[in-house]
Amino acid sequence: MRVAEGFSQKWNFPNCIGAVDGKHILIRPPPDSGSFYYNYKGSHSIVLMAVSNADSNFIYVDVGTNGRVSDGGVWDTCSLNQHIEAGSAGMPDDEILPNSSKVLPYVIVADDAFPLKRHIMKPFSHRNQNLEQRVFSYRLSRARRTVENAFGILANRFEVFHKAINLDPTKVVKIVLACTALHNYLRTAPVTPNVCSVANNENTEDIPGMLPLEYEQQTSTINGTIVRDLYMKYFNEEGAVIWQNRHT
């Protein structure tokens, strides 16, 4: 519940228990691997799927799926999604929203690379959004920025992500896991003169060793659509903040 409190207090998104995104980590393909690691950009990679808290610390990572798997397929096969679908992820019970009578599920915020489901919220399509939809998409995108920020800090702190990693993929997995653990440690440990401090930087567009997930058409569930509409109504009514319309 501490994660949800963080998103509510810092990013004005109640009942949010994380922000999810993924990156292709570029590698040099092993001999005789063929197109096994070949991704949508024509390079070779493994995928890092991660969830962050409101402070841009990683609270879940899944790394190692080969880049050939579609990005939707990576989410489908990752352990977190499988536990959510099976009801074994330990999701909190639905909770009443602040200053409201609406009882809604806890959710993870995502972007267009992910499906819309009861516990996975994504923005509305960018085409022909009305004001209420734009407000929802803005509020969600603010909260989701935390995971982009986490990736940006990770990539800028560890230069191993600045080019394709020329090691066996099993070793790359261990390196990525170690870097995410060190990222969390350095985010929470007292700064010392021997530890370089890296400013928050959510820009991963110019990191040569990382690629974003490919946006592809994802199926929306009926429950996901209903929950998103209820959050939209909340953000435009009792959950509105005075400055939100300036950004829509």
Kindly give the residue locations of the regions a language model identified.
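Short, polybasic Lys/Arg-rich linear motifs in disordered N-terminal/cytosolic regions
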Residues: 1-248
